[in-house]
Regions:
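The feature marks the mature, well-folded catalytic cores of soluble enzymes
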Residues: 1-239
Length: 239
């Protein structure tokens, strides 16, 4: 049997935001008996199960909370959802990734300045749902630049991205919007809200894919980071 060589990517493992969120929750779980997270704290079932063994349960709606402590997941939430939680007078532990929080602030600032906001991202992803809330009325999330031109475009248009998207695909998207929207838009502002640590992992996956015969991406199926790594490598090598 031929010898099989296994090589790991030079960048791998949980990103800083996820590691931070897990550490915060683990510390809180050791100090308190009842903690609930609004959705899974991270998109990794092994971590969710381990935290459940420590007494941390996940709920999908604020109405399911019976008291105690609520933790906001690393993906962040909308201001509307935050208000619902605060109205229940619960103690809140916020594990929102700092990079995601920066994207939320960018969306809020654009909205306050009168820009219509477009988010390059998956509309059903928890992070993007939160960003849409910070981006104000009329904000949209899409991965298709063609959709933008079909809208009733505002005179001032701002674009940000879901933090885990591909840099190259975000650049392609913004170029498409520039070409299609400029005849109608007076001012266009693009803010790079992508996570640099995520980009390093994508670059490492690409680097490994071009010299491999088979690529195995280890992660959870509903993780945006895992999906992006598979998308990067699959056009080059069986993944």
């Amino acid at each position: 049997m031929a010898k099989v060589e296994v090589e790991k990517a030079r960048e791998l493992g949980f990103c800083l935001g996820v590691r931070r969120a897990i550490k915060i929750i683990e510390t809180a779980a050791r100090e308190h008996q009842e903690i609930a997270t609004l959705g899974p704290i991270v998109h990794n079932q092994m971590v969710v199960t381990r935290l459940a063994d420590m007494g941390v349960r996940a709920v999908t709606e604020p109405d399911q909370l019976r008291g105690g402590i609520i933790a906001i997941a690393s993906h962040g939430i909308s201001p509307e959802l935050l208000s619902q939680i605060q109205a229940r007078q619960l103690r809140v532990i916020d594990t929102t990734c700092p990079i995601v929080r920066s994207a939320q602030k960018a969306a809020q600032k654009l909205s306050e300045l009168g820009f219509g906001v477009v988010i390059y991202g998956e509309a059903t992803h928890p992070e993007v749902k939160g960003l849409l809330g910070w981006a104000g009325t009329g904000a949209i999330a899409t991965l298709d630049g063609k959709e933008i031109a079909a809208l009733g475009l505002p005179r001032r248009l701002g674009i940000i991205s879901q933090t885990t998207q591909s840099h190259s695909q975000f650049a392609e998207f913004t170029n498409k919007v520039i070409n299609d929207a400029f005849p109608y838009v007076r001012e266009l502002r693009i803010i790079n809200t992508l996570c640099q640590e995520t980009q390093k992992r994508q670059e490492a996956a690409l680097e490994l894919a071009v010299k491999s015969e088979l690529m195995i991406v280890v992660g959870w199926h509903n993780s945006a980071n895992t999906l992006r790594l598979a998308q990067v490598s699959s056009p080059i090598v069986e993944s």
